[in-house]
Every structure is written in structure tokens, then in C-alpha cells.
């Protein structure tokens, strides 16, 4: 088996042991997925996972991606070949870009690989094997410690190079002409609205909400509290931000699952609720009830020139009795304790120099948001619809200025907010840049993948580890 580019300048011979390594990974991943789905009460058959691992793979059939009937042995074999071709395509390209030498993997990747091997080493010792002996027993002939290390390292190199190509596309600067051309061709996708919006528990409630709604929507917040589904939301909706959506596109509303953004029952390509909301006939003050959604228009559909925002936050989640309890299901006492902690942290910040750097340090020390902890709670180029409503409504308030702080509540806890400032691009330009860079990245990867291919040697394939229980 060989992976190479068209002119043969970059190629790698794939040994049987490498095939066995990938077969074991694919086999075990499939088995793990099946177990996970079953654990959550999902029928494996509905997800093409109805393989019986106690029987020969060659005696069971399934459907492949082309809806053809194949044996499970053939199905997994095809998956393995695709994985090898993809990994070695990017590995070889990375090596070529590094003057023919293997690029270094990151320190974290080296650590992860070392820890993985140590886990296998402990299992090997437990059953009286050397590490290589255990790996061969578990993954197939030839999968020794050195082979495992080699293939894992090459996989890291491939992933890193793929990320590098994507990063280069993301860093590309586009011209005003590029943005305007994108805008011209994607106007409908870029249209956004500012609205008050509430999702009722039933259509009858939505009709009653709409009927009681004042013409100026002055009672919108009160009605949200009245029709909220439980005690938590009745309190949460005291904040108008909970029911405010600034600069949301059709896609934003679809992703959030609002009833107004669902397709027509008979025509799945038609979205009556969105057609009404994004119509050129809409004006500020219009209100509408569609299914269980009630919406009040603050600003009608347009391609807004609102800038992206950069914000920091410190999430203080209620401390529940166990990790399985969602924050919104915490007790009043636990929520109260979280608010006191948030207030104390904000007071500490206000008593200091009130500099962004100080806020960032407090975030590192206190936030429950693991996604932003290491960079001091920072989120850059935030766009409407990206964050929860209350977070987003505060961040995109037109009165917001650098250095502003506040505490806002969400389903996840209390967010101590710090407004850093606006980004360089408008929200529609940022959306255009992401789409353009994604297109450029896709073009690069497609070109690269077309240049490389895999050839399987029939004779060598007779020695692949297939149709066996690799765990025994």
C-alpha cells in the first residue's frame, strides 16, 4: 500500500502493521460509539451501528455511504483506507513543507502520547506482557511500541498541518471589494433584526400573550414572567435581556430552535414565520404570533453596521450538590450564594485600579468557564446569536462603552461582565470573512487531497488483521 502525490515526489509505503493500527482504532471507536448510544437509550440500528462484535464481521451486512449493501468487514476496511489516505496526505504535505523533515509535535501532544503509552504499559504489566507484546495482542501484528509511537506522531503532524492551513486562511485580509461582492451575493443570509422574543409552552399561551401585549410592548417583560415555564425563568425574565435578540439572522433563529424559525409542515423549504419577520414590509413596533413564538420588532430587517464586540466575563455558577445538576436547577440558596460571590468579586475589582488586566486576573482565578479561563475570560469578535441572550443583549447595547461592568444572569450562572470595546469589522463583514476564509481553506484542502491518492497492493492486503476479535 502506498500513499503518494501525482508526480511521486512525496510518497510513503504503508506497512501491514500500519493498516492493523488503523483497523484497531476504527474498530474500537465503532465499538465505543455503539456502547455510548446504547447507554443513552438510543437504538444502534438507527445510527448504522447494529454490528454484533461477537460474530464475524464478514458474515454481517450494513449500508455504506453510497447506500450499497456491504459486509461489516468491507465497511470497516473502507473506513480504514480513508483514514490512512487522509492522515498520510497531510503528513506528507507537512513533511514537504518542512524541507523533507518531520515537523515537531507540540509539548502537549508529546505529553498526551507519553501518558497514553504509560496507560498501555500499566495494562501490559497487569497481564504479564511487555508493552510491545500487549499492543500486538490488542491491536494486531506489527503494532509494537515503536510503530504505535510513529503512527500517533504522524497523526498529530497531519492534524497540526491541517490546522495550519486553516489558520492561514483565517488570517488572510480581504478587501472592501471582496466584502461588497459577498454582500451582494448573500444579502438574504446577512439580513438581521433586533427583536423581543418569547417562546411559550403552548400555542394557546402564545395567542394569549400576543392578545395581552401592549402596542408599545411596555408589558413584554411582565408577560414573559407570567408565561415562563417554571420558577427559575419567572425570575430570570425580570431582565429584559433574557427576551432580547440583537442583530440575529435567520440562521441564528433556526439554530436556537425557535418555533418561528421552523419549516412549514407541508413544504419543508418554506419558513412562513421567518418570511414575515424578515419581510421588507416590517417596521419597528410590529408584533406577531407564530405557533408558540411571540415576537416584537425593535428594528426591522437590514444589513446592520453594528460592530463585533470584545468582552471579558467571569462566570460564577451556583455550587450544586453534584456535578450532574444543571445550574438552572440549583436551589434559591445556591443561586443567592453565587450572586453574593459575583458581587464580592466585582466589588474587589472596583476597589482596585479598574484596569482590564486586573479583571483578566480575577477571571483566571474565579471563572467557571473553562473555555475562557486561560485567557482571562476574553471573547473577541463576538457576534449576535453567539452567546446566551442576556450576555449578548448587554454586550450589544448601543450605550455600551469600554470599561463598563455589570452582573447579568443566564441559565449557567452569574456573568460578571467587562466591555473591552468593539472589533474592527461589522458583524456582517465578520460573517463574510468567515465564509470567505472557509471557502479558501476548503479550496486548499481539496486541491491537496486531489494531488494525493492511495494504492492498495492485493498481495499485501492478505496479511491485514481483519475479521478478528482484536481484544482477545
Which residues are covered by each model-predicted region?
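N-terminal targeting/tethering segments
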Residues: 1-147
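Hydrophobic aliphatic residue packing
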Residues: 1-3, 314-316, 345
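Solvent-exposed, polar/charged alpha-helical surfaces in well-ordered, non-transmembrane soluble domains
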Residues: 17, 21-24, 74, 78-82, ...
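Ser/Thr-centric signal marking residues that sit
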Residues: 26, 367, 410
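Alpha-helix N-cap and coil->helix boundary residues
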Residues: 104-108, 112, 174, 357-358, ...
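PPIase-associated folding chaperone regions across multiple families
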Residues: 134-211, 250-340, 384-472
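Peptidyl-prolyl cis-trans isomerase
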Residues: 208-266, 340-389, 420-421
